[in-house]
């Protein structure tokens, strides 16, 4: 009986040893990918979501890393707050000054440029204030005229990167917009574009989201190509000290992937076929 038990024990130990060897003999990349599997929470702007960019990129990220990215699309201010509260692993946002403050405060590990597009002023196709004719590349002049004429303007009003840019532009104008003409929506970019369309109002939008929705809107680009309208996006892994549950390895994997040659090439191609030009221009440091 003792001999039988000894034989059974030996067989079991041999089986375990063979299993371990099999795991070690797996292709190196496959083992690493299995270890990396899991999920991350990506807090990002509504513009990267509404434009369709993330639907285009993230399946490739998951395919390459085995990591699923769960997206929370909010304004940049809310995304940064999620990072501060330890409720996101990595951020993809577009308000560089606020992002740099976030990192300087120790809430993020580092910030790196990913891509850019630009902001535009859009409005009714008939352009009641004739801004496109008179001020096609002067956003400060256009906002001043909108305020003077008390013409309906829709603000994001959500502490997003777009909202922060709009407020900075009003500061340059020297005006604090208020009154019935100025509508603070507290909504994402897609919803605000729909509101501007329905109310025949002007609004500031990022070019990518506007182009992705243009076919369903009665809005035209009114002011563009002003240096004040540059729109840079950055990636920030959240400091894992903010929350013990933060997936620091997954966040680092996303940062490295979004800055990689493959991802940068994908970003540069997105929108070319449908719109004749990319919705975002990759500019990660080489």
From Swiss-Prot:
Lipid-acceptor residues (S-diacylglycerol cysteine): 21
Chain residues carrying a lipid of type N-palmitoyl cysteine: 21
Membrane topology: Lipid-anchor
Domain of life: Bacteria
GO terms under cellular component: plasma membrane
Record note on quaternary structure: Monomer. The complex is composed of two ATP-binding proteins (TupC), two transmembrane proteins (TupB) and a solute-binding protein (TupA).
Protein's name in the database: Tungstate-binding protein TupA
Naturally occurring in which organism (per UniProt): Peptoclostridium acidaminophilum (Eubacterium acidaminophilum)
Taxonomy of the source species: Bacteria, Bacillati, Bacillota, Clostridia, Peptostreptococcales
Gene name of this polypeptide: tupA
């Amino acid at each position: 009986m003792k001999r039988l038990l000894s034989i059974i024990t030996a067989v079991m130990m041999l089986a375990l040893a063979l299993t371990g060897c099999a795991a070690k003999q797996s292709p190196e990349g496959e083992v690493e990918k299995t270890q990396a599997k899991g999920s991350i929470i990506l807090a990002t702007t509504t513009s990267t979501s509404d434009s369709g960019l993330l639907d285009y990129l993230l399946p490739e990220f998951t395919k390459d890393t085995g990591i699923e990215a769960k997206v929370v699309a909010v304004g940049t201010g809310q995304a940064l707050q999620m990072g501060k509260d330890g409720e996101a692993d990595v951020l993809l946002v577009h308000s560089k000054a606020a992002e740099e403050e976030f990192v300087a405060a120790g809430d993020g590990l580092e910030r790196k440029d990913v891509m850019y597009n630009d902001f535009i002023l859009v409005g009714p196709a008939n352009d009641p204030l004739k801004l496109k004719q008179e001020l096609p590349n002067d956003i400060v002049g256009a906002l001043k005229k909108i305020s003077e004429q008390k013409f309906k303007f829709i603000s994001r009003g959500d502490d997003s990167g777009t909202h922060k840019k709009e407020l900075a532009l009003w500061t340059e104008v020297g005006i604090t917009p208020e009154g019935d003409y100025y509508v603070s929506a507290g909504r994402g970019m897609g919803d605000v574009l729909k509101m501007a369309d329905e109310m025949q109002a002007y609004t500031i939008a990022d070019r990518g989201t506007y182009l992705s929705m243009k076919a369903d809107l009665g809005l035209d680009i009114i002011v563009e190509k002003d240096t004040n309208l540059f729109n840079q996006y950055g990636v920030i892994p959240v400091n894992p000290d903010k929350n013990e549950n933060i997936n620091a390895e997954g966040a680092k994997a996303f940062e490295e992937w979004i800055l990689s040659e493959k991802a940068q090439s994908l970003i540069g191609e997105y929108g070319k076929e449908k719109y004749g030009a990319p919705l975002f221009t990759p500019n990660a440091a080489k």
